[in-house]
A protein has these predicted regions:
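Acidic/histidine-rich, surface-exposed loop or edge segments in extracytoplasmic proteins
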Residues: 47-63, 106-107, 227-228
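N-terminal segment of the mature soluble domain
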Residues: 60-150, 192, 198, 202-207
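Charge-rich, low-complexity terminal tails
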Residues: 56-60, 71, 253-261
């Protein structure tokens, strides 16, 4: 009897430890997750295995300071896709055909507003799609870097939450610390990755978005307190990776998804 009790106690403690470990490793629920859209039936039907990442935005053109970071972010997106079993064609395969089509239909981007003429965009994409059939591509992936706005919470812990991520404030410049009168409710610029996936019929099969990082920091040189553009934009690779995972969920499953399953 004592041996049985010891065994039972051991199994109970082991089970409890495993449960606590599982709970501690689970992502904290974040209500700010983006409401993704996925056509699962079409995804299953298309059996997407080979993709190409477009060098252009699907929506409004990114801000200049984000556009400069786009090739680096696309490279990380490509690596993530390959890790998950996808074949990623070189971006130049898309870019060369896109540029040729632009010469026929004109640039769909209005330089004065940054908005995209969807009629021209559709004509160009139809041409690109037709010319890329022999490459074996199954889907086109658009990766738009968006500038949004968020604010830090009040209280003892100041964090900003948007598109599934939680970020702490960063400081920039010499100073003695954040003023006690600093307005934590002031809006600051943040960046997110928006992913849109279209199949060979140019039907959208997935749309998602994941937060990346704040693109502004607290200016320590300001006595009143203000935000300034960060010198290094999206330099934290861990934050970028998190945003990529969130942007692709559930097209690519992730244990780090902080929303409801």
């Amino acid at each position: 009897m004592p041996r049985f009790s010891s065994l039972s106690r051991y199994l109970f403690i082991t089970s409890l430890s495993c449960l606590l470990l599982a709970c501690s490793s689970s992502p904290t629920y974040n209500p700010s997750v983006f409401p993704y859209e996925i056509d699962q039936a079409r995804v299953d039907q298309d059996d997407i295995k080979t993709v190409v990442i477009a060098h252009v935005n699907l929506g409004v053109v990114s801000r200049n300071y984000l556009t400069k970071e786009a090739p680096r972010i696309d490279a990380q997106v490509s690596a993530y896709l390959k890790e998950n079993g996808f074949k990623v064609l070189p971006q130049r395969e898309f870019e060369q055909r896109w540029n040729t089509a632009v010469r026929s239909y004109g640039n769909p981007v209005d330089p004065s507003t940054g908005k995209i003429n969807m009629k021209s965009f559709t004509q160009i994409m139809n041409t690109v799609r037709d010319e890329m059939r022999d490459t074996g591509v199954d889907a086109f992936i658009f990766t738009d870097l968006l500038e949004l706005q968020s604010a830090f919470s009040g209280g003892l812990k100041h964090v900003a939450r948007w598109d599934g991520v939680t970020r702490k404030p960063s400081m920039q410049g010499a100073g003695d610390g954040v003023s006690a009168d600093f307005d934590w409710g002031m809006l600051l610029d943040v960046a997110s990755l928006q992913v849109s996936i279209y199949d060979m019929e140019l039907k959208r099969v997935f749309a998602g978005r994941g937060g990346l990082d704040a693109t502004q920091a607290i200016d320590m040189r300001s006595s009143k307190g203000r935000y300034v553009r960060r010198r290094e934009i999206l330099e934290n690779e861990t934050h970028v990776r998190e945003g990529i995972e969130l942007a692709f969920y559930p097209f690519i499953d992730s244990e780090n998804w902080p929303g409801k399953r």
